[in-house]
Amino acid sequence: MGQKTSPTGFRTGITLGWQSTWFASKADYGNFLIEDQKIRAYVDKKYNRQMTKAGVAKTEIVRTRNEVKITLHSARPGMIIGPRGGEIDILREELEKMTGRKISVNVIEIKEPDLNAFLIAEALAEQLGKRASFRRTMKLYCEAAMAAGAKGVKIMCGGRLAGAEI
C-alpha cells in the first residue's frame, strides 16, 4: 500500500522555503514554536476569518537575537496597513503585547491572487458556504486561474455537495 506524504514537508527546502526561519536552543525551541503558532493563528483569525478579509495567504516569521520579523503576503495589503499605516501599528502593538518581544511587520502584495492556491481555496469555500453551485464555482475559479497564467489547475472538492443524502 502506498504511503501519503505531506506536500509541504516534501517540498520544503527543495522548491519551497521555510515558513519560519530561526534557530533556538533545546530550552527555547518549544516556546518559540508555540509562539509562532499563536502569531499565525492570530493573524489568520484577524485577517482571514473575520468580515474584513485581507486575503493573507502566507505568514513568514524570521527571528533574530533582538526582534521577530513577520512578513504577511496579502492579496489586499491596504486592509492590513490601514489609513496612514494606523492598522499595521495596532497589529504590531498587539503582537508585541502577546509575545513580549520587539516585532516588525512587513506586508507584501500578492500580484496575482488568482494564482495563489490558498486564496482560491478560501474563496471557493466561502462560495460553497453561501450555497452556490459547486460545479459552476469550481469551473469559474479554474478558468480564472488559467486566464491569470497558470499552466494547469486541479481543484478537488469533497463532502456532501448539492445536498446529497447518505
Where do the language-model regions lie?
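RNA-contacting regions in translation and RNA-metabolism proteins
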Residues: M1-I166
